[in-house]
């Protein structure tokens, strides 16, 4: 390497941290890293070759089993679709198309360049244009789960969620009565109409509840009020992802930590990703990369790049199958942003237009891949190295 790590450490005023790390590596009995990427960095910057590369793992007991994947996905997906219905329907002149749809997500720390959020959103913008031009009857909803500075919650959105919940509760109260009316109509072979199922007072009450729905000038891009110069809003504008009614790809910026009591999705992170169809992680730099691994463990397809330690390990061990890989590894090493965006767009289009049966096969392959990274298995690497 032509780098002078010590000089750079002083230039960036991190000499104390650097010297501690360098000497820790120098005098350690066993020196390891989690990936080939960090092993190369260690040799260049800390001047010691690693004794072994020990990949990171996860506790698979926290994730659904093969048998549970379909049931939990359906449950969590339906909760997400319900949120999407409440979020978008006040602004659409046609019915909100949530049933014939796919749920994608991006997540991670707010490192827009490193995490690849920029190329991901630009590729999604291209996908939006392609789906519109080809008039493909599918809708993509993309959540951006990235904690960020907020001004306030979007009160209109929150009030609408409360209103729709009120309507749902009212219909629950009427359920037995509506069931009885429907049953009588069927038994007596009478024509079924709205008037037969709901009386005038009930219709008026429903109209009263719906009258509380609030609208803004355009469909919101986020669950929260953000600063006007927010970097994600700038990227949405650049990518043409503005949540117009005709858009096939719509975005929901979710700038808070997911929680079962956050007031919007009311799901924790693992539940939210389990209810999705695809996680998108086109990182520019990732020593390991837990987010795609967690996504696979949840039984969900993922996209990552060859600049992550996780993808490097998968390729080195030849764990992928060509037909249903479960995860797609985009070439990002020595590639321009334009080349990355093009390949990512092609992969997104391929996944979007998959048959349902093929998506299901990829889901199970994703979960199978994750089984290689259970700590129950990987801990043996540490024990063997220690005993040697």
Regions found by a protein language model. Give the residues of each.
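Catalytic cores of nucleotide-sugar-dependent glycosyltransferases that transfer UDP/GDP/TDP-activated
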Residues: 1-388
């Amino acid at each position: 390497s032509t780098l002078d790590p010590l000089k750079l450490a002083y230039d960036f005023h991190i000499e104390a941290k650097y010297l501690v790390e360098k000497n820790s590596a120098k005098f350690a009995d066993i020196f390891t890293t989690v990936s080939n990427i960090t092993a190369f960095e260690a040799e260049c910057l800390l001047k010691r070759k690693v004794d072994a590369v020990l990949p990171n793992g996860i506790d698979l007991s926290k994730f659904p089993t093969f048998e549970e994947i379909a049931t939990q996905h359906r449950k969590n997906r339906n909760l997400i679709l319900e949120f999407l219905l409440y979020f978008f329907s006040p602004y659409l002149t046609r019915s909100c198309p949530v049933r014939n749809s796919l749920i994608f997500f991006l997540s991670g720390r707010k490192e827009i360049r490193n995490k690849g959020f920029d190329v991901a959103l630009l590729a999604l913008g291209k996908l939006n244009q392609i789906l519109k031009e080809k008039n493909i009857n599918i809708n993509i909803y993309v959540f951006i789960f990235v904690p960020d500075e907020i001004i306030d919650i979007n009160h209109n959105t929150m009030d609408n969620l409360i209103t729709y919940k009120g309507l749902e509760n009212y219909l629950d109260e009427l359920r037995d009565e509506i069931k009885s009316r429907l049953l009588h109509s069927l038994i007596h072979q009478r024509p079924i109409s709205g008037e037969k199922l709901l009386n005038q007072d009930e219709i008026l009450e429903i109209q009263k509840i719906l009258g509380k729905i609030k609208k803004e000038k355009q469909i919101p891009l986020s669950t929260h009020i953000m600063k006007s110069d927010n970097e994600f809003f700038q990227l949405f504008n650049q990518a043409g992802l503005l949540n117009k009614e005709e858009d096939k790809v719509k975005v929901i910026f979710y700038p808070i930590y997911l929680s079962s009591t956050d007031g919007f999705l009311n799901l924790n992170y693992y539940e939210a990703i389990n209810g999705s169809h695809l996680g998108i992680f086109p990182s520019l730099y990732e020593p390991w990369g837990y987010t795609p691994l967690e996504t696979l463990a949840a039984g969900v397809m993922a996209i990552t790049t060859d600049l992550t330690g996780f993808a490097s390990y998968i390729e080195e061990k030849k764990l992928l199958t060509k037909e249903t890989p479960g995860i797609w590894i985009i070439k990002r090493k020595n590639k321009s942003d334009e080349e990355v965006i093009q390949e990512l767009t092609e992969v997104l289009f391929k996944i979007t237009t998959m048959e349902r049966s093929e998506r299901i096969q990829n889901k199970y392959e994703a979960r199978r891949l994750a089984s290689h990274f259970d700590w129950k298995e990987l801990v043996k690497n540490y024990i063997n190295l220690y005993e040697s």
